[in-house]
């Protein structure tokens, strides 16, 4: 998914991929995707490397990032997407190998700085290793910031109705740490934990301790929804809240926070470029201080 997204940008050039998979299989997985469809371009393998749209991309299969020799192919930024090297110490091996910066595509396991577009991205000060947090945090944080900046959040609860992930089971299987997580993904709505709401307090310190949440894993292949229920400091009608979110989506958060009043469903957001889209018709207010946002 990182590769497909990067290929659509003129300001990003992919020069290398490190994966333990065979190059032929990597090409196959890039060409065909059950959720996002066929790749819009040409994909070949030559001399053990990928050739995408006529451009050769170096393929390596190193277990230790320190041996990757990123300097030989002029790597500026590494997208660390293995889910393994999630600390500054381990991710720094990419720097040792010649890369200039590393972006972790998931939450770090230490105090690696975390940045989320639409939340605290403007505070980035050139750190060489950063975390982009999780997809849920990227969805929740921009919305929470708009609400807090305009109306103030006293406290809130978040529920994410989350699409199936690759770690789930197709049928019931052993899962010693998470018994419910071992149940068949296609047959169940599975309650689960998530640190996304608490993580918002790390990228928006003014909300630290004010939000928490949980997740439901549901049998859909892609697109998740965040249900944010908050108690407001400043009374506001639902129309006023919508107006503030729409203004942000057309102004400072354009391209990050979207806004829609259409009668949409989850598949309408497959391939969405915004990290968060506010569904104006799905939310509801109990009163001017207690509101559910979707």
Curated annotation (Swiss-Prot):
Family: Belongs to the glyceraldehyde-3-phosphate dehydrogenase family.
Annotated residues for binding of NAD(+): 19, 63, 105
Catalytic activity: D-glyceraldehyde 3-phosphate + phosphate + NAD(+) = (2R)-3-phospho-glyceroyl phosphate + NADH + H(+)
Pathway(s) the chain acts in: Carbohydrate degradation; glycolysis; pyruvate from D-glyceraldehyde 3-phosphate: step 1/5
Active-site residue numbers: 135 (nucleophile)
Lineage: Bacteria, Pseudomonadati, Pseudomonadota, Gammaproteobacteria, Enterobacterales
EC number: 1.2.1.12
Gene Ontology terms for molecular function: glyceraldehyde-3-phosphate dehydrogenase (NAD+) (phosphorylating) activity; NAD binding; NADP binding
Name of the protein described by the UniProt record: Glyceraldehyde-3-phosphate dehydrogenase
Keywords: Cytoplasm, Glycolysis, NAD, Nucleotide-binding, Oxidoreductase
Annotated GO biological process: glucose metabolic process; glycolytic process
Main location: cytoplasm
One GO location term (cellular component): cytoplasm
Cross-referenced Pfam families: Gp_dh_C, Gp_dh_N
